[in-house]
């Protein structure tokens, strides 16, 4: 029904719709790298990273509240990339949302982050 507010846990359901699979919050490591995932698919093909919507990320929003991963601030790119390295996933749905005091969703922005070879190598090299 339209009068039922969207609750914070429901943002994960929206991410699952974008990704097309169920997501599970997990932590993982690979060698000296570790990552925590707001969501990882069972086949480890996709990850989901969720942050609080900042003015910096809000300014990136373009069509239909999506923005390009190249526009994503570097510290978020590094986090997404490290998650892809550790999980072996091919892409990460990055979401940022703002919630009201009553746990109602105010705004959400998304982008698909796909591995960037140069950044990946910098992380691997330390």
Task: Specify the residue positions occupied by each region the protein language model found.
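Charged, glycine-rich intrinsically disordered N-terminal tails and low-complexity linkers that flank
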Residues: 1-14
């Amino acid at each position: 029904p339209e009068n039922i507010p969207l609750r914070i846990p429901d943002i994960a359901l929206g991410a699952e719709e974008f990704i097309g699979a169920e997501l599970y919050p997990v932590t993982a490591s690979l060698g000296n790298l570790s990552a925590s995932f707001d969501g990882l698919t069972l086949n480890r093909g996709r990850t989901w990273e969720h942050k609080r919507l900042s003015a910096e990320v809000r300014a990136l929003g373009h069509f239909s509240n999506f923005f390009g991963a190249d526009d994503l601030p570097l510290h978020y790119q590094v986090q997404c990339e490290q998650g892809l390295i550790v999980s072996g996933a091919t892409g990460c749905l990055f979401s940022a949302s703002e919630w009201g005091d009553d746990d109602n969703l105010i705004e959400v922005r998304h982008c698909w982050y796909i591995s960037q070879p140069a950044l990946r190598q910098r992380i691997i090299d330390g």
